[in-house]
Amino acid sequence: MKLSTLFMALCLACVTSVSAKNWEAKWITSSECQTRSNSWICFHKSVELPSLEGQTVYADIAVDSKYWLWINGEMVVFEGGLKRGPKPQDTYYDHVDITKYLTQGENSIAVLMWYFGKDGFSHKSSGKAGLLFDCQANGFKILSDGSWN
């Protein structure tokens, strides 16, 4: 019992509420399936990056409901996201170390998002599909906005 309580506390420590962060990124979605249940949406962004020497780079990522993240063809996150609630506007985000996947020069970021569109056991639907991707490092920013495909 003590071990499971410790494990639960460690898991919750890695997930943070969106309202606790000052976001520069914008929520992005697809006009075809913003509110349709069981929707899958792909997002893609190509970015040119300077040298990353000596720094650790994190991306803060929030979705309603689950996501998969690839950088330069390598899977970084498998089934991220999900926790929402207790109100529809309450969103948590994942703080992901993406340093080892990035390179100096051209980088490709792809996110596949699955929007459930309904409430679940530990999930309160926001009522709309969306992605929030915020990566701010020394010398560059990668932010979800209208430039993503």
Residue ranges and their predicted role:
Residues 21-33, 110-149:
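An acidic-aromatic loop/edge-strand motif
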Residues 31-41, 82-91:
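Extracellular beta-rich ligand/substrate-recognition surface
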Residues 54, 99-108, 136-142:
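A short, structured loop/turn motif at beta-sheet edges
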